[in-house]
Amino acid sequence: MSVDNNNKAKQAYNNQTGVNEKEREEQQKQAEQYREQNEQQQFENKLTFSDEVVEKIAGIAAREVKGILDMKGGFADNFTNAFSSGNNVTTGVSVEVGEKQAAIDLKVILEYGESAPKIFRKVTELVKEQVKYITGLQVVEVNMQVDDVMTKKEWQQKNEKNNNNNNNNSERSGLQ
């Protein structure tokens, strides 16, 4: 009985002085939650990707789709490729990258006889999948512009001609 009397006396004292055990525990819990929130706000982690990284991912993914012979760049890409090996995977790809989303534009050369709508669906699916998997970014838009249509043979002949021209230019300038 003395334990009950002791608890009653303690409870009466706490009530008189305004100290309530449950209230005190609740206040401590709220203070701890507040501290945790402040710590989380102070140490905010961030993962970002440059536009060039997303361009590379999209360019590699698009080239994997059957029916895409090549990607076609603008003047700057053509100028850059004239002085390089021509294996720039970002050629024909431009992107806008936000914190959580990306929009991708592609300029392609299609193989004659292939269905552009089917290729577009496959490219869209693969590009979205790869960008999401590698970066975590949601691709909200994929636009594909068909700049040329060639037979595979025609495309190979054009590439052989370009490779021969690049090799001749390298030899003339002393580059290897």
From Swiss-Prot:
InterPro entries linked: Asp23 (IPR005531)
Pfam hit, one: Asp23
Region annotation Disordered: where it falls in the sequence: 1-43, 154-176
Bias (Basic and acidic residues): 20-38
Low complexity composition-biased segments: 1-16
Similarity annotation: Belongs to the asp23 family.
The protein's role, per its UniProt record: May play a key role in alkaline pH tolerance.
Protein's name in the database: Alkaline shock protein 23
Protein source organism: Staphylococcus haemolyticus (strain JCSC1435)
Gene name, Swiss-Prot/TrEMBL: asp23
